[in-house]
Curated annotation (Swiss-Prot):
One Gene Ontology term from the biological process aspect of the record: proteolysis
UniProt topology in membrane: Multi-pass membrane protein
Induction of synthesis: More highly expressed in exponential than stationary phase, it is induced 2-fold in response to model apple juice (pH 3.5).
Ranges facing Cytoplasmic side: 1-3, 55-157, 214-293
Main location: membrane
Name the record gives this protein: Protease HtpX
Keywords, sorted A to Z: Cell inner membrane, Cell membrane, Hydrolase, Membrane, Metal-binding, Metalloprotease, Protease, Transmembrane, Transmembrane helix, Zinc
Native source organism of the sequence: Escherichia coli O157:H7
Annotated residues for binding of Zn(2+): H139, H143, E222
Keyword Lyase appears in the UniProt entry: no
Chain ranges passing through the membrane: 4-24, 34-54, 158-178, 193-213
Cofactor note: Binds 1 zinc ion per subunit.
Localization (cell): Cell inner membrane
Cofactor(s) needed by this chain: Zn(2+)
Length: 293
């Protein structure tokens, strides 16, 4: 499924651009209520822009090609498998794409359950058995059926709102303290350059810290997507697919795409910032049936 750093980077870029426009035009709300309204509009705005552009951004990021008409047996099998599983999951047929990468990976994205995309790497088609590939596709179909992208958009919107709100409150305080010469009765945010610089830095820092929340959600939904795959094609097929991933190449997708793929990077500074749970934990969760209840 399509998810996180590309999503986060787009959100961050939108917030920084909005902040720059507001600062240059002098549109600074001195009231807490006004600032909160602005934060809500821009916070959720960035999330929904990312959601609406998600298919285009994902395909562009990996150089994916949508299959309009299957050209060979492999593409025909892929399209038929996606169609069968989409019917089983009760969703409309997603677009199907292939992208060139040596690693075993796949992702799904889209603004709605009935307007989605499933993409798989050439490495997956070449190195996985049909049963394993079927399980990976079912994992991505489950992400779509669970509505993970919409849920993530709402979570990211709330996170964005608080990042904007808190950073600008602190920026106003810093600007007023460091350069705020103002006449009596005059409303001011202090030095506008200090305000913009502090607000931008704080938005970047708080945005990174807030990503812990979205990373947690990303890991949590991976367990549920694994369980969804097990229900669609069988638990053993999904376990076999995860075991195959343990021996696969290090993913070659851009770092910004890791949260959108089934096979996220396993090496990270901390599990707090990992988009995916360790593969061993995912396999154990399937064996115990923890998320199948």
């Amino acid at each position: 499924m399509m998810r996180i750093a590309l999503f986060l980077l787009t959100n961050l870029a939108v917030m920084v651009v909005f902040g720059l426009v507001l600062s240059l035009t002098g549109i600074q709300s001195s009231s807490v209520q006004g600032l909160m309204i602005m934060a809500l509009l821009f916070g959720f705005g960035g999330s929904f822009v990312s959601l609406l552009m998600s298919k285009w951004m994902a395909l562009r990021s990996v150089g994916g090609e949508v299959i309009e008409q299957p050209r060979n047996e492999r593409e025909r099998w892929l399209v038929n498998t996606v169609a069968t599983q989409a019917r089983q999951a009760g969703i409309a047929m997603p677009q199907v794409a292939i992208y060139h990468a040596p690693d075993i990976n796949a992702f799904a994205t889209g603004a709605r359950r009935d307007a989605s995309l499933v993409a798989v790497s050439t490495g997956l088609l070449q190195n996985m058995s049909p049963d394993e590939a079927e399980a990976v596709i079912a994992h991505e179909i489950s992400h779509i059926a669970n509505g993970d992208m919409v849920t993530m958009t709402l979570i990211q919107g709330v996170v964005n709102t608080f990042v904007i709100f808190i950073s600008r409150i602190l920026a106003q305080l810093a600007a007023g303290f460091m350069g705020g010469n103002r006449d009596e009765g005059e409303e001011s945010n202090g030095n506008p350059l200090i305000y913009f610089a502090v607000a931008t830095v704080l938005e970047l820092v708080f945005g990174i810290l807030a990503s812990i929340i979205t990373m947690w959600f990303s890991r949590h939904r991976e367990f549920h997507a694994d369980a969804g795959s097990a229900k669609l094609v069988g638990r053993e097929k999904m376990i076999a697919a995860l075991q195959r991933l343990k021996t696969s190449y290090e993913p070659q997708e851009a770092t910004s795409m890791m949260a959108f793929c089934i096979n996220g990077k396993s090496k990270s500074l901390s599990e707090l910032f990992m988009t995916h749970p360790p593969l061993d934990k995912r396999i154990e969760a399937l064996r115990t049936g923890e998320y199948l209840k």
